[in-house]
Amino acid sequence: KNYSKKVLSACKNKPVSLEVFADRNDEMIEQGLKINSWGKNIYVKIPVINSKGKFTGQLIKKLNKKKIKLNITAVYTVAQVKKINSCLDNKTKSIISIFSGRMGDVGKDPVPIIKKAIQITKSKNKVEILWASTREPYNYTQAKQLGCQIITMPPNIISKVSNFGKSLNQLTKDTVRTFLVDSKKSRYKI
């Protein structure tokens, strides 16, 4: 709670997602209400299912009816997006966080799922799709091209986005220079 309030004091005018720690719906509702009371810029982060695999739709509906902004997280499938979307009204802002990077980690292409999610939620202008667990800078380009409203990126990925626009010829030169520096550091001889 103290750490969350510290974050909120630093981010007064930015949306902040804070996740519940519970696994049971009644406890998640209690925690969600408490978290929501900490500020107007909060999105209460709720998993799409609990640890037993049960869809949290009733929880989503209850909190949404109370006008609590939600960030439904750990989403991977179009079916999950459809179920979530059916639980949300068009009065309260919500985010659906699709874990694109983790999909890629297991050899699945997240692009068709994000694309379909954007289409599914298009009729509800209060619902935004978030590209989560970004693994590489190009994910930023993919998300932007698809019309994904939000992308989360760790600092090491954000710093690489500044390289966008570099020519491939310059990239070749930079790569060869790196090879030369690495070979000198190795002190190997042929």
Briefly describe each language-model feature range.
Residues 68-159, 165-180:
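Catalytic alpha/beta core domains of metabolic enzymes, predominantly
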Residues 1-62, 66, 95, 100-103:
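Active-site beta->alpha loop and helix N-cap motifs at the rims of alpha/beta catalytic domains
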Residues 1-9, 154, 168-177, 181-190:
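Alpha/beta catalytic barrel-like cores
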Residues 30-34, 49, 56-60, 82-86, ...:
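General "foldedness" signal
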Residues 3, 43, 76, 138-140, ...:
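Sequence-level detector for tyrosine residue identity
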Residues 8-11, 36-39, 88, 118-121, ...:
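Structural signal for hydrophobic packing residues in well-ordered secondary-structure cores
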